[in-house]
């Protein structure tokens, strides 16, 4: 008797768990994926895109973005994305080659921003690629993302 109750309880738990997973994945299957080059940019995009898109980052928290080497699974994930969004200003040195192998739309957020040049150290005279750190420029990132995504998907404006 005890074995029967244990078996039925286990069966009930397994069936409840598998049913809830299926509902979650079905809800997201119809949403397009936006792939960001790094986590901070993905966070900004999530705040712009709200629930209209699934937003993912190629790199994970704590990973060095500047010299990142995309993996084969990154290419597979990117090939099914609606759009790839990167920062620009040389922040992701790997992005140009990465995107050249894909047939995916690309938005480079800092592309139309005037650079702020680094004034000292080894990088003196080069554009500072961390433009989102400035609150003013962070707001420009949001404006650029709203305009770019609205242009690509006017129905999601």
What are these regions (language model features)?
Residues 6-7, 118:
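Hydrophobic alpha-helical segments with strong N-terminal bias
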Residues 9-16:
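Bacterial N-terminal signal peptides
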Residues 17-157:
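Extracytoplasmic metal-acquisition and chelation regions
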Residues 1-4:
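Positively charged n-region of N-terminal signal peptides that target proteins for export
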């Amino acid at each position: 008797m005890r074995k029967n109750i244990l078996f039925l309880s286990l069966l009930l738990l397994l069936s409840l768990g598998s049913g809830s997973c299926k509902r979650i994945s079905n809800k997201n299957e119809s949403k397009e994926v936006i792939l960001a080059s790094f986590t901070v940019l993905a966070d900004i995009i999530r705040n712009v895109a709200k629930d209209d898109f699934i937003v993912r980052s190629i790199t994970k928290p704590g990973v060095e973005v500047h010299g990142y080497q995309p993996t084969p699974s990154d290419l597979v994930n990117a090939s099914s994305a609606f759009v790839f969004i990167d920062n620009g200003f040389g922040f992701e040195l790997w992005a140009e080659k990465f995107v050249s192998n894909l047939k995916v739309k690309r938005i480079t957020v800092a592309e139309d921003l005037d650079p702020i040049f680094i004034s000292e150290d080894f990088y003196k005279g080069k554009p500072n690629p961390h433009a989102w750190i400035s609150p003013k420029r962070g707001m420009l990132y949001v404006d650029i993302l709203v305009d770019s995504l609205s242009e690509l998907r006017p129905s999601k404006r």
